[in-house]
């Protein structure tokens, strides 16, 4: 008959085994989503999710109350696998798309997305803004497992990566649910990332999504070619600054913005009027203006 010492050791081994089995079961549950119940509106109801987060706009922090053009954009993204967005500066398109990713990351276990930006500074800034959105949600069930400007992971939920579009990036794309190329017209590696992503996305079928958004950067680049392409399955969306109510209600907004930024007529046509021809001679660096 085993003595007390042996029983104690046996009990410790049994407890350790029990802990391991629980950990494995938790991993399986997270991977499969079994038993998961979304506490927030899903992507199809993004217009209800957005106001749960707070954003910085016009120098203040307040709940994200999306405009109709932003609601229409997310609705079209939900309904299409491939979306390309031509936009003016300062229309909040990048933050809107990332809010959609945040919604999916919090409501779909195993969800993953990658957002590629022009530089590490750009990707870090976007990651910081979306991390702030996530942190602003008043719900104790949201638990970060990784919280940085390049990766946002939630326990039992999804992950969003924010990465610079370097030449090496195309070779390291993980299997993701959504791939976003922010300011795609300005990404030197856009075509290689796009090409590398297609086989990865094909494993997820119709659930995978590819989103490109940008202001124009002349003709001949991948973004311009896709935008001007034929009826090839791309969902083409255009967001002009005049569709943003806070700008539209001020008849002098365009004039004041142009003068404040000291823009030439050519730069204005590119950055705000979405003119591809004018942007062939770009003189206004995109990183100087908030997307």
Residue ranges and their predicted role:
Residues 2-291:
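Phosphate/NTP-binding elements of NTP-utilizing enzymes
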